[in-house]
Amino acid sequence: MQTHTRLLDELCHLTAQSLASLETSDHFQIIKLLGEGSYGKVMLAMHKKRGTPMALKFFQRDSTCLLSFLREYNLSLAFCTHPSLTSALGIAFSTPTHYVFAQQPCIYGDLYDVIIPEVGMEENRVQQVASQISGALTHLHSLGFVHRDVKPENIFLCDRDCRWVKLGDFGMAKAVGTRVQCIWYSSPYCTPESKIARVTKKIDSGCFEVNNNGNKEKVHGEKPEKMYCTVDPSTDSWALGILVYAMLTGNHPWSETVSDNVAYKRYLQWRKWGISVSEKIWSHQEPSRFMKFTPLAASLFRSLLHPQPKCRGRPEEMGEFLGGAWLMDQKKV
């Protein structure tokens, strides 16, 4: 794994030395917008000389660190050889306003647009996607990298029926074991171990800090403390579990992964006691959102959504859960 991270660093160094400055319109015919986000945008384009269709990913220079751009490009170019990972095409350049690299085009949009709210997707399609994304994550993990941002918006379609999908957007990807700032955010995709980032540290009122004007001022009250955690593949396992739930139901299992969230608390009880006991627990309450699943799917969720990262299931185990029914017959629920 360390060999792969060293190779990535070397590739970034070499690319930085050879990164050309080009005018996009001189070499590419822009066809249409494929997507956009906080980083910039992705455009479908045609290479004028080769006649090759490709997706050009534009990163705004004023808000993008060059090293971050180089790492995403080279990770996609050198390591994303799995058929369900988007691969770069060996073209990277800069313009006065953007850093740009070319990648395989996925012209049918992303998975977010396929999932019908409150309904989800057909179960066979869900299993198709789950199989492909688990394979993509297994490949990344075997090389020592963690995606860290698995969600429907980052899964791209190569056809309308989800027979072939690709996991993309490696801007958050890091090597296993890297120390990063732990960030908690209000989302089911946020892992339970990220709750440490909500902790605040009391600052002694006698301390001083430098304000925006460069002057020292006394600090009072509480100040958030930066917390750090180690990058681990279990983060992707958790996201994979939430993704499967979203595809099956068109909903999220809970709004945020915190112990005082009612839906998450009920999940923990359901996970601990099982379906039969859950029926008694919720006989006079809203039933668990996980009681609609077959025992096979229930086992999958218990594995991927284990609250303890060391006990969490791995993407390569997905094959054990494929082929059987995941949703109960609604007439029997």
PLM-predicted stretches and their roles:
Residues F58-F79:
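Conserved N-lobe beta3->alphaC-helix segment of eukaryotic protein kinase catalytic domains
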Residues C158-C207:
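Activation segment/activation loop of eukaryotic-type protein kinase catalytic domains
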